[in-house]
Amino acid sequence: MAKPIPRIGSQRNRRINSRKNARKMPKGVIYVQAGFNNTIVTVTDVRGRVVSWASAGTCGFKGAKRGTPFAAQTAAGNAIRKVVDQGMQRAEVMIKGPGLGRDAALRAIRRSGILLSFVRDVTPMPHNGCRPPKKRRV
């Protein structure tokens, strides 16, 4: 016999969700993935478990506006606002990708009040691997 599906607002579900939100985390890692079309900001604890994330698309930007620096700044602000409420004070920043949102996201992270222990560029660089896509002719 299948288990009954718990009600949405049940006591058990409320207890689980409150435990997840109550987790204090003084240190974390912020990953910024800046592509030409979108910027994704992921915040994890030191063990690598995702605590919060945001992208320019989830912040309401559509189409070509997702690749703009302002969209990256908004996404970084939204992702960090959640973890500052949980008590994050120090963070390491890993930036990946060639997009326009790299600097804007880093600026938003610095402005949030979190102390940055280091900022590392982890953009993958080929040692002459795959052939790149052809250049655009406009």
Curated annotation (Swiss-Prot):
GO biological processes: translation
Any Pfam family: Ribosomal_S11
Localisation per UniProt entry: Plastid, Chloroplast
Keywords per UniProt: Chloroplast, Plastid, Ribonucleoprotein, Ribosomal protein, RNA-binding, rRNA-binding
Any one annotated GO CC term: ribosome
GO terms for MF: rRNA binding; structural constituent of ribosome
Record protein name field: Small ribosomal subunit protein uS11c
Native species: Fagopyrum esculentum subsp. ancestrale (Wild buckwheat)
Upper taxonomic lineage: Eukaryota, Viridiplantae, Streptophyta, Embryophyta, Tracheophyta
